[in-house]
Amino acid sequence: VHWTAEEKQLITGLWGKVNVAECGAEALARLLIVYPWTQRFFASFGNLSSPTAILGNPMVRAHGKKVLTSFGDAVKNLDNIKNTFSQLSELHCDKLHVDPENFRLLGDILIIVLAAHFSKDFTPDCQAAWQKLVRVVAHALARKYH
């Protein structure tokens, strides 16, 4: 994947403003609420019976932070995303059996969360760079699938 200097700047500039815990928790909660079939991968998280329960669930918050923290690894390694997510791809494919389509869904939700939090900074050019990034990350995570 080729990144222009402008794309890199737009991605890293916005990322520097992201509250990983807050945005990560919101993104994962939205995934579980908007696409309820994804909840089956999180059965061990306890009560996911309603949007209120999901939004208040400490395990959802913690895992959302973990997910977005690893997304930060993509931002730090824009030129090597495939290798950066190699082990996570294996884990989600071989052990967790997560449908790779869910990575795309989470990426789309992350775009919505970023737009909501940073509306002034989230210009069309910024959105285009982030759409490219979430697409590349989703592809890297789906790489180990057969």
From Swiss-Prot:
* Subunit organization: Heterotetramer of two alpha chains and two beta chains.
Q: Where is the signal peptide?
A: none
Which Pfam family, giving just one, matches this sequence?
A: Globin
UniProt keyword Oxidoreductase present: no
Give the residues annotated as coiled coil.
Answer: none
Q: Which UniProt keywords apply?
A: Heme, Iron, Metal-binding, Oxygen transport, Transport
PROSITE patterns, from UniProt?
A: GLOBIN
Transport recorded as keyword:
yes
What is stated as this protein's family in its record? Belongs to the globin family.
Per UniProt, where does heme b bind? 63, 92
Q: Which Gene Ontology terms cover its molecular function?
A: haptoglobin binding; heme binding; metal ion binding; organic acid binding; oxygen binding; oxygen carrier activity; peroxidase activity
**Where's the Globin domain?**
2-146
Q: What does this protein do?
A: Involved in oxygen transport from the lung to the various peripheral tissues.
Protein name from the UniProt record = Hemoglobin subunit beta
One GO CC term on file = hemoglobin complex
Q: In which tissues is it expressed?
A: Red blood cells.
Q: Name one GO biological process term.
A: hydrogen peroxide catabolic process
